[in-house]
Design a protein with these regions (language model features):
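Glycine-rich P-loop/Walker A and Walker A-like loops and their local beta1-loop-alpha1 context
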Residues: 1-43
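Structural motif
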Residues: 6-11, 34-39, 73-79, 106-109, ...
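P-loop NTP-binding module
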Residues: 7, 14-15, 27, 35, ...
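Short, flexible loop segments at the rims of nucleotide/cofactor-binding pockets, characterized by
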Residues: 9-10, 47-53, 107-114
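Short, charged/polar "capping" segments at the starts of alpha-helices
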Residues: 13-15, 38-45, 81-83, 111-112, ...
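Conserved nucleotide-sensing/catalytic segment adjacent to the nucleotide-binding pocket
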Residues: 30-83
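Phosphate/Mg2+-binding loops and adjacent switch elements
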Residues: 76-155, 159-161
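C-terminal accessory "lid"/substrate-recognition subdomains
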Residues: 140-205
């Protein structure tokens, strides 16, 4: 099972981003797009793709780690962010699944205008491997440059990329390949520990 988590407020752009990834990538297998139920969602219009609307207040995330499939989970921007991520991380740990990538799609136009939204996105980016800078048409170029530099000065390891047009990622391969770059370890599975002492191991009572 390949699983990806996406966060952001411009859901039309996120939808286009996922559809672009599905159409341009082979070997994804069965694809399920899990999105907040209150939002209409544009499908990629491909046979192997199914939409899975969910209620963030009642959803229980259950996946088969051995299934040859791909899941995209879009976090609800109107529901408590940290609560959703903690619930998701707990459910995924029970399934023994780590997301291959956690992605934040930044609405640059709205973020430039709102300090509150900038704080929300900063929280998202703390958990992210990749940050996609989107909806830049009406955002100041200096703001977009300074926004990225802000996180570089803080030594955030996440990768910053651009969304072009309606939401097409410039480097789709970077979104789908494994390789965590996130600061948070919330989604990391704990390392397995042996049930019995290894040979030569001394256990003190």
């Amino acid at each position: 099972m390949k699983l990806y988590i996406l966060m952001g407020t411009h859901l039309a752009e996120i939808s286009q981003c996922i559809n672009h990834l599905v159409k341009s990538t082979k070997d994804l297998g069965e694809v399920k797009i899990h999105h907040p139920a209150e939002y209409e969602w544009a499908s990629a219009s491909q046979d192997q793709v199914s939409l899975q609307p969910y209620d963030p207040d009642t959803v229980l995330w259950v996946f088969d780690p051995d299934r040859p499939a791909t899941a995209f989970i879009v976090v609800d921007p109107k529901t408590d962010l940290i609560g959703q991520l903690e619930h998701l991380a707990d459910n995924l740990a029970k399934c023994q699944i780590e997301p291959l990538k956690v992605v934040t799609c930044v609405d640059c136009e709205r973020t430039e205008q709102s300090a509150k939204l900038r704080a929300w996105y900063e929280a998202c980016i703390y958990y992210s491997d990749v940050v996609l800078l989107g909806n830049r048409q009406n955002a100041g170029k200096s703001f977009v440059r300074e926004y990225q530099k802000h996180f570089e000065r803080l030594c955030y390891p996440c990768l910053f990329l651009l969304l072009k047009g309606a939401g097409n990622p410039t480097q789709p391969g970077e979104l789908l390949t494994s390789g965590p770059r996130r600061i948070s370890q919330m989604f990391d599975l704990p390392e397995s520990t042996p049930d019995e002492p290894l040979p030569g191991m001394v256990i003190e009572a």
